[in-house]
Regions:
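RNA-binding accessory domains that recognize and position tRNA/RNA substrates
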Residues: 1-156, 168, 180
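Cysteine-nucleophile active-site neighborhood
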Residues: 160, 165-224
């Protein structure tokens, strides 16, 4: 989960025909703090030129804040390096995706009852829309916890393995994930990953990862 949301304009009532919940309501429901009225373009330019800074977004019902305490907590935050956040967001129980496909106009989320392939997805923080795309391609998807052993994964007799997206430092998650992936590689099954999963696969194959100074935003993902 995101811990905070920063937007320029005030959040207004939704008007998109696909909308089912006001963003303000969703933030409150999930206890995510938000703030409006910030010059987000200026903030983006600052991040572009200086890298991502530490920062705090805080809420107080009384409107009073202990600035010194908030500042000290921000300064002390160690950042994402060496943080295994995947274990905090992974599924606690293995499950089979319910088969809903990607959204189509005038149809919505149609269920797929036709399966040609079986994919085991290792969940490091998987997005539902990725699962929907698997359904588009007639894949049955079994989602397992990030610490599930290679033996248990292979017991599902999958046609392929998917390593999902997720938060945190890939090297930290790799402390347990690399051994699992290396065991799966030995079985010559098709394996691919997205985002964090892709980075962990690279680590398993002897590559190195490091945090980008400026990161990337939107669709501008650099490839070298």
């Amino acid at each position: 989960w995101a811990r905070g949301v920063i937007v320029n304009s005030e959040i207004t009532s939704p008007s998109n025909y696909r909308s089912f919940l006001h963003l303000d309501t969703w933030l409150k429901k999930n206890k995510i703090v938000g703030i409006t009225g910030l010059d987000t373009r200026s903030l983006t330019n600052f991040i572009r030129d200086n890298g991502a800074p530490k920062g705090t977004v805080s809420f107080s019902k009384s409107g009073k804040f202990n600035i010194k305490k908030l500042t000290n907590n921000t300064i002390k935050w160690s950042g994402l390096k060496n943080l295994d956040l995947a274990e905090t967001v992974t599924t606690q129980k293995n499950y089979v995706w319910k088969g809903l496909k990607t959204w189509k106009k005038n149809i919505g989320y149609k269920k797929n009852n036709k399966y040609s392939f079986h994919v085991v997805a290792i969940d490091y923080g998987i997005k539902k829309n990725i699962l929907r795309y698997f359904s588009d391609f007639n894949c049955k998807v079994t989602v397992v916890s990030c610490k599930t052993s290679a033996e248990k994964i292979l017991n599902f007799k999958p046609n392929g393995i998917f390593l999902s997206n997720g938060p945190g430092d890939p090297a930290a998650t790799g402390r347990y994930a690399i051994d699992i992936i290396n065991e799966l590689i030995k079985k010559n099954l098709p394996i691919f990953g997205i985002c964090l999963g892709h980075q962990i696969l690279a680590l398993a194959l002897g590559g190195k990862t490091k945090k980008m100074k400026l990161g990337h935003r939107g669709a501008n993902h650099p490839v070298k």
